[in-house]
Amino acid sequence: MFYPHHQSQQSTTTNPSKHHDSQDVRLPGTSSWSRHPSHPSFTPSLPMPSPSGYPPLGSGYPPGGHHHPNVNVHSGIHGPHPSFGSGMGGNGGMGHGQGFGMGMFQNGVQTSPPRGEPVPMTSHWQTQMMRAEASRSASSPHHRARAAAISSRATNKPAAVPIVDPNNRPSSSYGTNGLHRKNASSVFNGEPTGTPPLSDPSLTPAQNPAEPATPAPVAGQTESKDEEKPNEPWTGLDLGGIRLKRLSTALFSFTHVTSLYINHNALTSIPSAISSLRQLTLLDATGNELSTIPSEIGVLSKLKDLLLFDNNLTTLPFELGTLYQLDCLGIDGNPMNADYRKKLVEDGTRGLITYLRDHAPPPPPPPERQWIDLETDVDTPTSGKQESFSVLTYNILCASFAPATTYSYTPSWALDWDYRKRLLLEEIVTASADVVCLQEIDCKQYADYFYPMLKKEGYEGQHYPRSRAKTMSVDEQKLVDGCATFWKEEKFRLVETQVIEFNQLALQKTDMRTEDMFNRVMSRDNIAVVAALEFRASGGRLLVANSHIYWDHRYRDVKLVQIGMLMEELEKIVEQFSRYPVKLDTDPEYNNGKPPKYERSEKGRDIPLIMCVDLNSFSGSAVYDYLSSGSIPGDHEDFMSHLYGRYTASGLKHHLGLRSACAGIGEMRMTNFTPTFAAAIDYVFYTPRTMKVTSVLGDVDKAYLDKTVGFPNAHFPSDHIPVFTQFRIKGHLDPLPLNGDPYH
């Protein structure tokens, strides 16, 4: 997570037990916010990169030998590298025995250079040779553009037709479905296609034990909230066969390009700025004079064809290992490392890419995330000393939701659960938040690992699995994920815990038993866990809700119904909590020596409330607006014309007066980061009438993200990042407007 130890502006009278003032939770040998080395309580110790920068030998790491293998260079003299196949030969081909890239047929088409040893003609190598010969035959100037024009005339289409991937083929059998979650539907041009396998109303929760939690790309929005769909009329660019010696940087401003042909030129290098072309699916650099290719190509995660035939390449950057959708890596005609060539012959492109991915040294860690101060954390004379506390919410990516087929851009050792869980624990311990809310944590990992390890760090906790666990055997229940809430025992006392099961609530609402409620809502077994806490020192109360809302954007009506039911239950719980007897034996330093007092007329709305939620929705969505504004009309478009009784008849409304803790900074840039999705979907909501946000932890360094395909990776153990905030109780209740509505 890489965040520094936050130095609060708290006054000297502030509780000295506040997490960022304690010293005993720091990891030995590090500053208080560094990630490594491991905490001494970890068993076994978390293996970390050696001083050389490579992963050490041991369980969970790739085998030794992370340096580039020795290059097997063929004998022979390197002669000039031809870039054109036509107009250079007479009768008879050019000599095949001297150097690389010099063999040519009579028609001027380049052939593969000689090799010291014959290459076994496996199916993978046959494919390699077929693609190589196809690329070599396209050596004339603008070959693909001319072919596209001829094709358009033959089909009676306008002549000025763009190049639209003439080499486009069906999707790779190796690749994923284009989304970052298993079983999600594919998306083309922003429109979902196919039937969402996890959204079939006939499917019961028990039949979907690995339900994804992160939203699928939505219409017109396949990667992130801020990205716009390109509207250029062309997507291909053919600069082939024109003797280019260098590429202009202006080329890389065409970020919408999906196919780039720079084949059969005289290029000796490809600029690193090619990383700007994130939409590329095909890059053909055949027949140049390249001796290296930039590591930045590794961030072009949409690449399916990377054709580098007939160059002077002896090795490949490890960063190509993140090209998880690559179907064809063309290396024939290069004096390539013998081990790489052998791997390609035997295991194909996927085998070579996987080898590079798993043997790549860990990249440099990102800079620490920086704290952003919003308000001063000091006491006021009128309210006296008040409680300060910190909250961290984190979707930790359950092991059963992280198969290698879904996160194929992640090194196998970094995706391994033993590695990830230790890194997750280290993040939580290093943060030392007073309240920790985790989502996607299964029963086994909670009971066997996180609870006992966090117990040693002074935490107490509660965990509840999804509703489907009730219908499963004991062994099956262990793998069901849910929500866990932890709190510092020295700071809080647990009063009670309640679990809210959305599908059970739907069943109980007799006035809302519509067909849509049965088919769309009751089959989703998301939950919320509510912990009623009491500050040990001041006797003040704090209600903490921890929830995980359904993931699929195509079922955003379900999200609205779930969040509507959650708010109804929270209003009941806070009112019940307000009726509890007040603690009288409190620390006289707090609240000017007065015990806390809660008015019955407020119905619990004067009790500080925190809601940590993986909302699976953007700011500005219907569920976000409902939480932030207190109401949503019944005819809102996100109900999608479905019927949910009074919810769609009169709309949703609550009176808790919530606000996102990160609203003051315009929300996080992202809290979920994969190759196909990057946006903020995790939030901490609070009641601004009763407390204030003093600081929030900022975004991950943008320069680091620009060089990263997605999470998890060596430094980030989940596809989400934690949202970390610090609060201070006000000690008084801000007055309501005249109409009594906290939002107006």
Swiss-Prot record:
Protein name, as recorded: CCR4-Not complex 3'-5'-exoribonuclease subunit Ccr4
Origin organism lineage: Eukaryota, Fungi, Dikarya, Basidiomycota, Agaricomycotina
Gly residues composition bias: residue spans: 86-100
Keyword Metal-binding: yes
GO BP annotation list: nuclear-transcribed mRNA poly(A) tail shortening
Domain of life of the organism encoding this protein: Eukaryota
Gene encoding the protein: CCR4
GO molecular function: metal ion binding; poly(A)-specific ribonuclease activity; RNA binding
Organism: Cryptococcus neoformans var. neoformans serotype D (strain B-3501A)
Compositionally biased region (Polar residues): 1-16, 29-43
Catalytic activity: Exonucleolytic cleavage of poly(A) to 5'-AMP
GO cellular-component term (any): nucleus
Positions contributing to Mg(2+) binding: E440
